[in-house]
Amino acid sequence: MMSFLLGAILTLLWAPTAQAEVLLQPDFNAEKFSGLWYVVSMASDCRVFLGKKDHLSMSTRAIRPTEEGGLHVHMEFPGADGCNQVDAEYLKVGSEGHFRVPALGYLDVRIVDTDYSSFAVLYIYKELEGALSTMVQLYSRTQDVSPQALKSFQDFYPTLGLPKDMMVMLPQSDACNPESKEAP
């Protein structure tokens, strides 16, 4: 019993430390990061994600910086009834490129790697339905991801203990594709 308690305490002490070791994009620039992104791939240990990952499609993020140093993010997700939309405020936490999103249960969001013009890798530590989980998302400025972007993503997510079977490359969808919509 004592060894179980010791193991549980060590696990609790270790988890926040391991989570906090995820580095940020050096000299993150919110202005350069703003604009349209496609979510082209994800990896996660979230049980809800794992149950739905084979039925997901690419979604979009339209991002703009806020005066407070955060990000306003407009998300569009393909659904059975068309394109679902959600707006969220990414609140700055300490360093540039580090956020939390209380409305979505995102306790920790970090821009890990980006070249601003073609890709970004995001780390998300979240709570969903009472369970904590880790997610990594690969953003691309186009629906066709570059080899450099894919390599950065594939090199990063396993360092968090996420195996390949927890990753999905998302198929393209016209439901939320701004390029397929007619101009107003």
UniProtKB/Swiss-Prot annotation:
Signal peptide: 1-20
SUPFAM superfamilies: Lipocalins
GO molecular function, a single term: small molecule binding
UniProt source species: Homo sapiens (Human)
Gene Ontology CC: extracellular region
Pfam families listed in its UniProt record: Lipocalin
Name of the protein in question: Lipocalin-15
Keyword tags: Disulfide bond, Secreted, Signal
Cysteines paired by S-S bonds: 83-176
Similarity comment: family membership: Belongs to the calycin superfamily. Lipocalin family.
Glycoprotein among keywords: no
Cell compartments where the protein resides: Secreted
Source organism, top-level taxon: Eukaryota
Main subcellular location of this protein, as a coarse class: secreted
PROSITE patterns, per the entry: LIPOCALIN
